[in-house]
Swiss-Prot record:
This is 3,7-dimethylxanthine N-methyltransferase 2. Mg(2+) binds at residues 178, 260, 262-263. Highly expressed in developing endosperm. Detected in young leaves and flower buds. Present in immature fruits (grains), but barely in mature fruits. GO terms for biological process: alkaloid metabolic process; methylation. Pathway: Alkaloid biosynthesis. S-adenosyl-L-homocysteine binds at residues 18, 61, 66, 100-101, 139-140, 156, 158. Its cofactor is Mg(2+). It comes from Coffea arabica. Binds 1 Mg(2+) ion per subunit.
């Protein structure tokens, strides 16, 4: 089976679907002010045709309610500028393209569109024809839009996914060079870490080059993804998954060879690696870069404070929180896990993930490192 056929979130609307388990993104409120600033600066710059039709691409939109949370924030940011100008006629038509791989559950996405349009008219006074939303399926590591056609490109929690498993993870004798590991983790040797970094460098460079061609001069990109600000200071979702698969091997429920042949195309870069690649590729200026922490169990309760490390790591809801974390992890990785190990293993694996998540939450290290980076396409010399 081709890798792209399983590199998607779990579809549908069941208990293990991404739609039911993606609410944690709603609590990453650090992104919204930067998003608003990007869009408002774009509109005030009076770039070509932007006040007639503002064109947006959401790269790696996945499925579920949070797809439209981002869209709503974009629309509200655009309309906020119109309100400041006190001229409703200056509100541009908005055209938004939702992008993900062909296997993404776009059916679930567009089932939510009628209610989104109703809420948009109620909250923003926008008729359906003033905000046009469509799909643009395909890999965001390839061309998606015509040259110099887009004003703003956005991607949230996608760019840590690589286009392929790095080469060099198997020796000439066919033995795994990353035994006991499923990605570039703490136990991986330097050659493995270099292989993953090399693949990320290649992919991120391609991403920047291709999408710089699609953006108009001085167009913007806002990217948020997993990083490793503190080297292995606290385990991320991949570490939870790796620990849990190893538990199944130790307990005799899974063959060691199955684990050793499982390599996930994910890499969490450092901010220095991100900055270096952007500067070396050369198409963009870095306007803003910030790292922050998102807790494992964000989305478990709307009453929690998820702005940082402020909440207590121990809770009377510990087991429920850990089960929530396991459901989120399963909703993200189930297609690739089922493809390699088979579906029968998933319930036992989820149980181990919950047990390991409880331990990490109890230790106070249940956080993901994330980076937000705002980029502006450098103008051509003739435009300066």
């Amino acid at each position: 089976m081709e890798l792209q056929e399983v590199l998607h979130m779990n579809g549908g609307e069941g208990d293990t679907s991404y739609a039911k388990n993606s609410s944690y993104n709603l609590f990453l409120i650090r992104v919204k002010p930067v998003l608003e600033q990007c869009i408002q600066e774009l509109l005030r710059a009076n770039l070509p045709n932007i006040n007639k039709c503002f064109k947006v691409g959401d790269l790696g939109c996945a499925s579920g309610p949070n797809t439209f949370s981002t869209v709503r924030d974009i629309v509200q940011s655009i309309d906020k500028v119109g309100q400041e100008k006190k001229n409703e006629l200056e509100r541009p038509t908005i055209q938004i393209f939702l992008n993900d791989l062909f296997q993404n559950d776009f059916n679930s996405v567009f089932k939510l569109l009628p209610s989104f349009y109703r809420n948009l008219e109620k909250e923003n006074g926008r008729k359906i024809g003033s905000c046009l939303i469509g799909a643009m399926p395909g890999s965001f590591y390839s061309r998606l839009f015509p040259e110099e056609s887009m004003h703003f490109l956005h991607s949230c929690y996608c760019l840590h996914w690589l286009s392929q498993v790095p080469s060099g993870l198997v020796t000439e004798l066919g033995i795994s060079a990353n035994k006991g590991c499923i990605y570039s983790s703490k136990a991986s040797g330097p050659p493995i870490k270099k292989a993953y970094l090399d693949q990320f460098t290649k992919d991120f460079t391609t991403f920047l080059r291709i999408h710089s061609e699609e953006l108009i001069s001085r167009g913007r990109m806002l990217l948020t993804f997993i990083c490793k600000e503190d080297e292995f200071d606290h385990p991320n979702s991949m570490d939870l998954l790796e620990m849990s698969i190893n538990d199944l091997v130790i307990e005799g429920h899974l063959e060691e060879e199955k684990l050793d042949s499982f390599n996930v195309p994910i890499y969490a870069p450092s901010t220095e690696e991100v900055k270096r690649i952007v500067e070396e590729e050369g198409s963009f200026e870095i306007l803003y870069l910030e790292t922050f922490y998102a807790p494992y169990d964000a989305g478990f309760s709307i009453d929690d404070d998820y702005q940082g490390r402020s909440h207590s790591p121990v809770s009377c809801d510990e087991h429920a929180r850990a089960a929530h974390v396991a459901s989120v992890v399963r909703s993200i990785y189930e297609p690739i896990l089922a493809s390699h190990f088979g579906e029968a293993i998933l319930p036992d694996l989820s149980h181990r993930i919950a047990k390991n998540a409880a331990k990490v939450l109890r230790s106070g290290k249940g956080f993901y490192d994330s980076v937000i980076i705002s980029l502006a396409k450098k103008p051509e010399k003739a435009d300066m």
